[in-house]
Curated annotation (Swiss-Prot):
Gene: rpsI
Record bears the keyword Ribosomal protein: yes
Domain of life (superkingdom): Bacteria
InterPro entries: Ribosomal_Su5_D2-typ_SF (IPR020568), Ribosomal_uS9 (IPR000754), Ribosomal_uS9_bac/plastid (IPR023035), Ribosomal_uS9_CS (IPR020574), Ribsml_uS5_D2-typ_fold_subgr (IPR014721)
Family, per entry: Belongs to the universal ribosomal protein uS9 family.
Keywords, in A-Z order: Ribonucleoprotein, Ribosomal protein
UniProt KW Nucleus keyword: no
Any Gene Ontology biological process: translation
PANTHER family per the UniProt record, alphabetical: RIBOSOMAL PROTEIN S9 (PTHR21569), SMALL RIBOSOMAL SUBUNIT PROTEIN US9M (PTHR21569:SF1)
GO cellular component terms listed in the entry, alphabetical order: cytosolic small ribosomal subunit
Protein name in UniProt: Small ribosomal subunit protein uS9
Organism: Rickettsia typhi (strain ATCC VR-144 / Wilmington)
Amino acid sequence: MTELKIKTEKVVKQLTKESLKPVLKVPKAKIDNASQFYATGKRKNAIARVWLKVGKGKIVVNNKILNQYFPSETYIKTILQPFLLTKTIDQYDVICTVRGGGISGQKGAILHGISKALDKSAPCFHAILRKGGLLTRDSRVVERKKYGQRKARKKTQFSKR
């Protein structure tokens, strides 16, 4: 009887320890040095092809360093978001080519592509990236112009009399 009591106390202690752990604990990923991961990201009219491989954190976009391609610091911060969430900021090198769209669309496409490639590299990152909303494609695109109107929603001025 006492042995059963001791075992149950141990189980209860383990359960309380596990419940006290933080929810977003980032597990250590087993990284294969020889592998390279490919993913495509899309946003508006931009399509990014992203190659992710183990390295020192170097990011190249259309044969230019990230700082040269995106001069704005806010764009750079959003592109680095998947690495900050998974705490792998200096573990991967990124090479990507982007076509179509503007700067904002290209930024979103690169972000989506990096997130998908990170998910392929280590499946333990899937829950973290999903919770951050980085794996879902942002499907918002420009609404088309309708005939008889000035723009997509703007109409000609209406006169009652």
